[in-house]
Swiss-Prot record:
Domain C2, residue spans: 386-513
Protein name listed in UniProt: Phosphoinositide phospholipase C 9
Biological processes annotated in GO: calcium ion homeostasis; heat acclimation; intracellular signal transduction; lipid catabolic process
Modified residues (Phosphoserine): 276
Cofactor: Ca(2+)
Gene it is expressed from: PLC9
Amino acid sequence: MVNLRKKFEMKQANQPGRVPNYFRNKYHGYDDDMPNLLPTFIKLLDTEKDEDGAGLNAAEQIDRELKSRKCDILKFRNLTILELPHLNEFLFSTELNPPISDQVRHRDMNAPLSHYFIHTSLKSYFTGNNVFGRLYSIEPIIDALKQGVRVVELDLLPFGKDGICVRPKWNFEKPLELQECLDAIKQHAFTPTRSYPVIITIKDSLKPDLQSKVTQMIDQTFGDMVYHEDPQQSLEEFPSPAELQNKILISRRPPTKLLYAKAVENGVELEIQEGSTDKNYQSVVGFHAVEPRGMLQKALTDDVQQPGWYERDVISFTQNKFLRTRPKKRNLLSNPPYKPQRAWMHGAQMIALSRQDDKEKLWLMQGMFRANGGCGYVKKPNFLLNAGSSGVFYPTENPVVVKTLKVKIYMGDGWIVDFKKRIGRLSKPDLYVRISIAGVPHDEKIMNTTVKNNEWKPTWGEEFTFPLTYPDLALISFEVYDYEVSTPDYFCGQTCLPVSELIEGIRAVPLYDERGKACSSTMLLTRFKWS
């Protein structure tokens, strides 16, 4: 149950009557006429998707909360009383009137694991703080799991006489103990709403005796939670997320110093690792993913102008096998990974990003995995999974607009709470919103609202149109900035959302800080409409 008491009192005291004024102007009515306009209001808030029922469900929840405070309001459907403060509260609640659903579609979790994009982290134990404090900690692992990350990466090195530690090679910061990391993963991997499998990717430079010790530690920590491949059974397809609920999968990424041979499968150049490995260690590795090399790597770069045979074969390959992308070099700051949308449109399941990566890429990653209730698994579109009559899909050929998204930004609120100490010290901020689409090249677009000068609660009322050829691969981003004449514009919040999950109607869009932490009050009142 959402506690609205504090929010309601704050909005009563501070929020202007702009939204009620908007409805008055739109319908040419007065306060007494507002109840008669309620069916239109609910229609704006409702969605055609029966599973959401956002308008009525939120109305009933508001009714229960207000009645618990002895506030005189009847259910919205009764059409008896509708007071403007309640309408204000409903519209501006990011919990009661969200832009996307927070429900996991469990019925869609029965396909093979390779049919999903998986929320993946890189160097999961990095704090990103290499100036003050420890560079490595279990806290980033815990935070990542709480945010829905399902792939955790650990680098294992020998430590002392027969010990094993977690840290990158050629780095002499105080390392982490492997057992400490395993315990943190076990404790935070699963909740009632995040029960789908967690994959631990291990990169090791260990001799067979230490590999055997790692196997014992994994078995002792996780026990029956560890997924083991049945050596007597040849699987054509990997089990589904539903079948692997509350399971730990171990994936190994051997160091580059091991010898490798090149093989070609479906036209895709693969890396085959060879080297001395403990048999028990091999048995605990139940998950295998290849990484880009040769033409496969070229297909995922950003400078490809025309599709080649290798790009089609990448998509064909990822229909039933796993592909993981990561930075090309060790230096994460100097060489960021491929753009996430480039890899997603080729069907790559795991795009690894770290806290040291560009913030814009992190926003896209966070936006993609807000889909499906934030469970960390997003089903690929059908056109990435099945070959059509003309062969394997390729997203930049023969684009045809299939849907048009219209986005109207009415107003925003909350900056005086979340950003007062950083902006508007000498005067009120000059805020504007940047709206962009990330997806296949034909769909990508960036637009800005006008700058609203000297406003803590700006009103824009501007509409933007985005023709989309592949909406299932599109993400919409909102970035708010305080306009500056002589210095870079100051960041004032952002969010990224999967376009396919948007609920039509007037929605309260919550904003986040640069690292994806939710702002306490800042939001945009926005309308989404499909045509």
